[in-house]
Design a protein with these regions (language model features):
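N-terminal Rossmann-like NAD(P)+-binding subdomain of aldehyde/semialdehyde dehydrogenases
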Residues: 1-110
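Conserved C-terminal structural/oligomerization subdomain of aldehyde/semialdehyde dehydrogenase
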Residues: 2, 36, 327-474
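ALDH superfamily catalytic-core signature
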Residues: 6, 169, 202-346, 408, ...
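Residues at or immediately preceding the N-termini of alpha-helices
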Residues: 15, 34, 52, 236, ...
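Short, well-ordered beta-strand elements within core beta-sheets of diverse protein domains
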Residues: 24-30, 121, 228-230, 260-263, ...
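Structural signal for hydrophobic packing residues in well-ordered secondary-structure cores
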Residues: 30, 45-48, 52, 63, ...
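Residue-level signal for inorganic ion chemistry
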Residues: 37, 82, 143, 174, ...
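Rossmann-like NAD(P) dinucleotide-binding subdomain of oxidoreductase/dehydrogenase enzymes
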Residues: 102-238
């Protein structure tokens, strides 16, 4: 016990010293220079390109993620984000003039963007490179210093990211600290100026509680159960292909993956047949033999997912291999629940309580879209919402539901558009990022009003005998 306490104290001291050195460096104001920020972004891009083969190899070892998928979902997103910030940073960082009311004249008003200061970025294991470096780009472009904490579960990728950070930046500017829960606790006990967390809602609550002690602003990129609705009038072929892709990319270990699917009874049979056709077209008859099909991250996650397979009727899939942590894409029919209250019956199932985060897709048949809408509305607000069907119903659902993002007649693609803000709402998170939103989220919007030193507005002073005139000017 004494040894554990001693190790904990040493870790706390080490983390405290890192934070202290970064705060001292930030106070030199060097990171506030636009030229400095652009230089760091270009250095980061060069290092990412230098280590790209190592990143690909690490992602393969951690997740069985093929090079093509790693490029599309990890490296290209980060490189594009860096390029976007390099191109637009000067414009984004320029003070923004705003109108000044007549009764405050003669004055000038503007908003200036200054870095929060020291940022803590905690990233998950499912897209370990993308979800660490994309927020980091925002921290750099805003002028922050940063401490990075990767997930211990994607260890190979964490090691490569450590090499990139150590090779690119001075530790008093940007540094990475690896470890498990003890490191998280040590970091969250420190006073940061901003915390950016991506991960589970449960850990998000821990982060928010820790941040509240210092009133530290946070962005929480969490998850949740993102519904997918396939209505009559949809393009069944497109719906099948796009849902299978959205659910099987990274073996379903994606925060915005379709979590469960409501399908109208009139299209159910044809949709299921098409989905089976496409999953075998993508990965072959045996997806375990495909180099393009990922694996589950660890044994704990694998065992949790396997337990869901007994909670419904398997329409397709269900094959597993514990040694490889392989789970076949599985369609799980929940429509056969025969209790008086089907919704209550579904909600008793683990597969409908928890975010699935794997290649298992519950299928629920419906014939009344209003019932589906009410089901979604009465659940925690999801990170994403997917609808396949006619435009009229799509826009009606948009107006009566809430989510972090939406795709109509597709899945996941909204995340790939860097012109759209990405983030959750309610239990699926708070705060948005990507492109300019990333710059803004790490920046304090400082309101500035500069009054004239030659003319004064005398009516604003007591005894307020001109109040009627002031009212007319307001």
């Amino acid at each position: 016990m004494e040894m554990e306490n001693s190790a904990s104290q040493q870790l706390s001291i080490s983390v405290s010293q890192i934070v202290l050195r970064q705060r001292e460096y930030f106070l030199t104001n060097e990171t506030k220079s636009i030229d400095f920020r652009l230089k760091q972004l270009k250095k980061l891009k060069k290092s990412v390109e230098k280590y790209s083969d190592d990143i690909y190899e690490a992602l393969w070892k951690d997740l069985h993620k093929c090079k093509e998928e790693a490029f599309l979902t990890e490296l290209s997103i980060v490189i594009n984000e860096i390029n976007d910030h390099i191109k637009h940073l000067k414009k984004w960082a320029k003070p923004k003039k705003v109108k000044t009311p007549l009764y405050l004249m003669p004055s000038k008003s503007y908003v200036m963007y200054e870095p929060f200061g020291l940022a803590l970025i905690i990233a998950p294991w499912n897209y370990p490179f993308h979800l660490m470096f994309a927020p980091l780009v925002g921290a750099i472009s805003s002028g922050c210093c940063a401490v990075l904490k990767p997930s211990p579960y994607s260890q190979y990728t964490s090691e490569v990211m450590q090499m990139i950070i150590d090779d690119t930046f001075d530790k008093e500017y940007i540094t990475m600290i690896q470890g498990h829960r003890d490191v998280n606790q040590a970091l969250l006990s420190q006073k940061f100026d901003f915390i950016f967390y991506t991960g589970s809602p449960d850990m998000g609550r821990v982060v928010m509680e820790a941040a509240s002690k210092n009133l530290t602003p946070v962005v929480l990129e969490l998850g949740g159960k993102s519904p997918c609705i396939v209505d009559k009038g949809c393009n069944i072929d497109f719906a099948a292909r796009r849902i299978v892709w959205g659910k099987t990319i990274n073996a379903g270990q994606t925060c915005v993956a379709p979590d469960y699917m409501f399908v109208h009874k009139s299209v159910r049979k044809e949709l299921i047949a098409k989905m089976i056709e496409y999953v075998e077209k993508f990965y072959g008859k045996d997806s375990q033999e495909s180099d393009h099909y990922c694996r589950i991250i660890n044994d704990k996650a694998y065992n949790r997912l396997v337990s869901y397979l007994d909670e419904g009727k398997i329409i397709y899939g269900g094959q597993c291999d514990a040694e490889e942590r392989y789970i076949q894409f599985t369609l799980l029919d929940l429509s056969q629940q025969t209790t008086d209250n089907r919704q209550q019956s579904w909600l008793m199932l683990g597969v409908m309580k928890d975010e699935i985060f794997g290649p298992i897709l519950p299928v629920i048949e419906f014939d009344d879209i209003d019932v589906v809408r009410d089901f979604v509305v009465n659940r925690p607000k999801p990170l994403a919402f997917y609808y396949f069907g006619e435009d009229e119903n799509a826009y009606d659902l948009l107006g009566k539901t809430t989510s972090g993002g939406v795709c109509i007649n597709d899945t996941i693609l909204h995340v790939g558009n860097d012109h759209l803000p990405f983030g959750g709402v309610g239990e699926s998170g708070m705060g948005k990022y990507h492109s300019q939103e990333s710059f803004l989220v790490f920046s304090n919007k400082r309101a500035v009003l500069k009054s004239s030193n030659k003319i004064d507005f005398a009516m604003k002073y007591p005894p307020y005998d001109k109040i009627d005139l002031i009212k007319k000017l307001m």
